[in-house]
Each structure stands twice: as structure tokens, then as C-alpha cells.
Amino acid sequence: MCIFCNIVEGRDHGYIVYSNDRVVAFLDKFPITPGHTLVVPRTHYENFLEISEDVIPYLCTAVRKISIAVKKALKADGIRILTNIGKSAGQVVFHSHFHIVPTWSQDPDIMKDFVPRKEQSREYYEYVQKAIIETLKNI
């Protein structure tokens, strides 16, 4: 079974920041930057090109809303929104998802060399999760 399906269905733990009947968003286990969030459709689609057209508006609305919240909650200067389609493009988990990656002006080009990613502490995930959830209440 897909790791993202397991998180969506509650079989695996994820630091969920947003959820509705079509979409779930949770913190990336191996963040590129603090606040790196993944937005996934509840239904399993291998990649964005396979998503049912009736799901796309819900997904895009969630990506926008969560991006606003992440940017505000983490006081980021910018946001990168990306999705990889296929192994050659860097897709690792074959459940369609969007990466919301906050950026700051003083940071180097974090995407240029894909800085090494590592799992963070439980305290990190809980702090960021709470900040994003609280910010979403005002969006």
C-alpha cells in the first residue's frame, strides 16, 4: 500500500495540517526547508496527469490556501510549489502530490542542488503543524 494512502486513511502517522473530503495536507517527513508541506488528493492517483478533472479544483484551491498559510506562519519571503511526474522527473512516491516549499531571501538557491534532507524532531513537526493550523483558521 502507498505511504500517502496510509497517512490519508490514518494507518500511518502524518503531521496533518489540512483535511477535507477530497484533499489532505501534511508536513514532509524529510523537509527541504522548515514548513515543507505536501498536498495530496485522498484518492490514489499515480501523478497529476491522472487526476480526475473533478478533483483538480479542490486540489488547486487547497494548494493555494495552504501556501498562503505556510508563507504567513513561517514568515517566508516566498513559496515554491512543485510536483514531479515520473521517476525521471524525481518522483519518489507514486501518489500525486504537490510540494509547498517556503523560501527566504537570505537562503541559497535551495532547489539548485537539492540540499540533503533529513527527518526532524517530533517537536519540530508539532510546532510547525500548530503554526500552520492556527494560521489556516484566518484564511
Curated annotation (Swiss-Prot):
Location of the motif Histidine triad motif: 95-99
Stored InterPro entries: HINT, Histidine_triad_CS, Histidine_triad_HIT, HIT-like, HIT-like_sf
CDD domains: HINT_subgroup
Pfam families, sorted: HIT
Residues of the HIT domain: 3-110
Gene Ontology biological process terms in this record: purine ribonucleotide metabolic process; sulfur compound metabolic process
SUPFAM superfamilies: HIT-like (SSF54197)
Molecular function in Gene Ontology: adenylylsulfatase activity
Protein name (record): Uncharacterized HIT-like protein SSO2163
